[in-house]
């Protein structure tokens, strides 16, 4: 039988009786004593808070002492310039001062954290947010970012954009266009970097897997596109560009822009957001939508984007890649050639720019893509650009034009070297363990490999009929049976097979291309992509060459300018100075004048001219020096 005392619970009075202080001896405090007790507690808590604040301040001062004095002066002056919206000073400090201090003190380590420099700038949160944007950009460029850096950079840039977009009115901030472009370009770069890093779960630690599972929306495609489209909508940039293209006055354009779009900060952010949308849509594999976002952006030589070389090169590179994805090879060639000519002319002004390295790499990738496009769509192009292409990729270009299995490998290598690093839209399901295991067991194909397969399928369709094109160049008209007998494959082919190859060649040799009157990037008309066209009448093939004549005017102008510069250089160069005779040489002996019969001395006979020094064998004299001596 169970013991009933096992479930006995003592009464409350019995428990209180066991306390050390009897309940009847307790005397409640008076109101005055209670007030004094609360006051003492408040004073004690305040003293503790003060001590902690002083301790933190001492720690901050100790850390601030480790920061170089020139860095502290720079941060104070930078903060003051931003408060005063002093645009020239901000531009100088951003483009020059920041990079010089980075080279001097923080080439291989981080800048001080924002919390450490907060006392120097009066804890200004707007400036600290801008400083963090530069801080994380430096981490991505010089160091290896950790997962905390990736998360914090996303939170900081979202905080900055929320401040710009969700304020009650336009924020009183003025930043240089170079900084605004770099900010948005870095935003897209960090998004692509995080997407590639997130797409490989096998290389993640347990802590990283947990953080990715808890934050599936960090650096998501939706959040990035939402920010860019919000900036476009807030600035009314498309409406402004349409009004400017329609020839409306400045007042009318300002009225269309509205309260936010009329401010340079929002207008420039909206304009650069269109270019970043082009970039993102190309990476996500939607070239049509990428070109649609640029329908109101002018790509001429006087366009706003040409003010920033990095923006100019990036825009044309992704427009050309979008055209390649659509199979519009002539438009891609025109786009690449246009920006490469600009880069060659402006190269001397950007060799010392901190962005010159990345710009040069992008141009090098465009040379490789140009080698691909000119092979798939042969035709006249700029000679200077094609000379550089042959210098850089001469061996690959010969293989591409020769055709065969080697050409397919060369196409593959050049494409992987120069194409954008495409992104997978759907990241691994880190938040679902079972789904992640299934994903690891059967991972999806890489986005770049999918685009490579599509590209190679187009190449194979064209390369399979290259021999047929070479045969057609020899005739103006030829029968299909005779063409089958001359087949380069070495196999006997009937008329039907030859006609099928001709139809494939006809289809592969035509595409859409922009004309002179086209306004948007997607508009175009049907064009022949090479210098050969033909028609089929029954079994007879009529061939017509469409090679355009070379324009000699530009050739003569360039060479005349080069000759004029050479002549000016020769005329401005100093003439050679003949060395004086050495003082140690003996003086020439003087002979006495002969005495005439009349007693007067006769005039001395004229001295013979010294013989010209013999020219040593093998001595080379520059032509420019010969010209100066002759002059």
Curated annotation (Swiss-Prot):
It is found in: Cytoplasm. The keyword Membrane does not apply. Signal peptide: none annotated. Pfam families: Paf67. Component of the eukaryotic translation initiation factor 3 (eIF-3) complex, which is involved in protein synthesis of a specialized repertoire of mRNAs and, together with other initiation factors, stimulates binding of mRNA and methionyl-tRNAi to the 40S ribosome. The eIF-3 complex specifically targets and initiates translation of a subset of mRNAs involved in cell proliferation. HAMAP family: eIF3l. This is Eukaryotic translation initiation factor 3 subunit L.
